[in-house]
From Swiss-Prot:
The keyword Secreted does not apply. Keywords: Electron transport, Heme, Iron, Membrane, Metal-binding, Photosynthesis, Signal, Thylakoid, Transmembrane, Transmembrane helix, Transport. Coiled coil: none annotated. Heme binds at Y25, C45, C48, H49. This is Cytochrome f. Residues 1-24 form the signal peptide. The 4 large subunits of the cytochrome b6-f complex are cytochrome b6, subunit IV (17 kDa polypeptide, PetD), cytochrome f and the Rieske protein, while the 4 small subunits are PetG, PetL, PetM and PetN. The complex functions as a dimer. One of its GO terms (molecular function) is heme binding. It comes from the Bacteria.
Length: 327
C-alpha cells in the first residue's frame, strides 16, 4: 500500500502541479520535518496553509489490543469553489490529511481489515510518515469532491507484546487541508497568495509574459525564476525615492492596481485567490484491557444479583411479618 501511494502521489505532482507546487499534500511536511507535530502541538501543515478551516474527526472512545478500528476524518468545504492551480488556471480542490496516533498504533494491512473496512478505504492510499514513525499516517492528494471524508484503518497495540505501551487514555492529533498552500516548502510565496508592494512609491510599468520569457525585456526576464516562466506572469515596476523596485507576480492572482497608482510598502497589489485552508483537532482514545472489562462486567453482575437477593429477602420478611400479625 505504501509503495502504491507514493507512486500515485508522485505522478500527480509531476503531471499537474508544476515545478514548485504548494499543494494540499501533507507529503511536503516530510521534506523538512522529522515529526509533523511541533512541541507546541501545532501540525506543521499550518505553516504553509495559512487559512483556518474546520476539520471533523470520529474516533472510538475505547479499543482493545489487536482491534482493527477506523478513524474518520471529515474535510468540509464549498464544492462550488475552484482554486488557482500552479499554471494560473482554475480547478477543483484536492484534499489531504495527517493522523498522529500514539506510539504503538499503526496502519492496518488489507489482510487485517474487514470487508467493510476494505470498501471504505478502497480508493485511498494511506502511508506512514516514515519508517521510524509508523504511528503517523498520511493521505493525499485526493480529489476533494469524492473525498470529503477519509477513513483510516488502524490496529491497536498489545501491551503484552510491546512493553512501551500501557492501558491508558491517549490523545490522537488530526489535521486536514483542502486546496493548495500559500507558501512553498522553502518559504517562498506560491501563486495562491496575496502579493504586496515591495516599496512605497508609484507603479510605473506592468510587463506581461505572453508566451515565452523572451517576451520580456532582458533586464526584467532575468528576474523571473524558472518556475514562473509561464504565460500570464507579470513583472510590476515601482518607482520610489530609493529607485526602481520590481515584483514578479505569477499567473493566478488578479492585480488590484494599475499603472500610475500610488502604493505604500506592504499594500496588497493582488487579490487573495485562496479558497482552501487547514484545520486541526484532538481526540481522546482509551486502550482498554479486556480483563478489566470482564471484571467490570462481573462486578456489575454481582451488584445486580445482590440487589435482587435483597429485594427477595425483604419480600420474605414482609410476608412473615404479615402472617404473624394475622395469626
Amino acid at each position: 500500500m505504501k509503495r502504491i501511494g507514493l507512486v500515485f502521489c508522485a505522478l500527480l505532482l509531476l503531471l499537474g502541479m508544476g515545478a514548485r507546487p504548494a499543494a494540499a499534500y501533507p507529503y511536503y511536511a516530510q521534506m523538512a520535518y522529522d515529526n509533523p507535530r511541533e512541541a507546541t502541538g501545532k501540525i506543521v501543515c499550518a505553516n504553509c496553509h495559512l487559512n483556518a478551516m474546520p476539520t471533523r474527526a470520529e474516533v472510538p472512545q475505547a479499543v482493545t489490543p489487536g482491534q482493527v478500528f477506523t478513524i474518520k476524518v471529515g474535510i468540509p468545504y464549498d464544492l462550488s469553489k475552484q482554486q488557482v492551480l500552479a499554471d494560473g488556471s482554475k480547478g477543483g480542490l484536492n484534499v489531504g490529511a495527517v493522523v498522529v496516533l500514539p506510539e504503538g498504533f499503526r496502519l492496518a494491512t488489507e489482510a487485517e481489515m474487514t470487508e467493510e473496512q476494505r470498501q471504505e478505504t478502497a480508493e485511498t492510499y494511506i502511508t506512514p510518515y516514515s519508517d521510524a514513525k509508523p504511528n503517523i499516517l498520511l493521505v493525499g492528494p485526493l480529489p476533494g469532491e469524492q473525498h470529503q471524508e477519509i477513513v483510516f484503518p488502524v490496529v491497536a497495540p498489545d501491551p503484552k507484546e510491546d512493553p512501551s505501551v500501557a492501558f491508558m487514555k491517549y490523545r490522537v492529533y488530526i489535521g486536514a487541508n483542502r486546496g493548495r498552500g500559500q507558501l512553498n516548502p522553502d518559504g517562498s510565496l506560491s501563486n495562491n497568495n496575496v502579493f504586496r508592494a515591495p516599496a512605497t512609491g508609484r507603479l510605473v510599468n506592468i510587463a506581461t509574459l505572453d508566451s515565452d520569457i523572451s517576451d520580456l525585456p532582458a533586464e526584467l526576464a532575468s528576474l523571473v525564476p524558472p518556475e514562473y516562466e509561464l504565460p500570464g506572469t507579470r513583472v510590476l515596476s515601482f518607482e520610489s525615492e530609493s529607485g526602481i523596485h520590481n515584483l514578479v507576480v505569477p499567473p493566478g492572482p488578479e492585480l488590484v492596481v494599475a499603472v500610475g497608482d500610488s502604493v505604500k510598502e506592504g499594500d496588497p497589489v493582488t487579490n487573495n485567490p485562496n479558497v482552501g485552508g487547514f484545520g486541526q483537532v484532538e481526540r481522546d482514545l482509551v486502550l482498554q484491557s479486556p480483563d478489566r472489562v470482564k471484571w467490570l462486567v462481573a462486578f456489575l453482575a454481582a451488584i445486580t444479583i445482590t440487589q435482587v437477593l435483597l429485594v427477595l429477602k425483604k419480600k420474605q420478611v414482609e410476608l412473615i411479618q404479615a402472617a404473624e400479625i394475622l395469626g
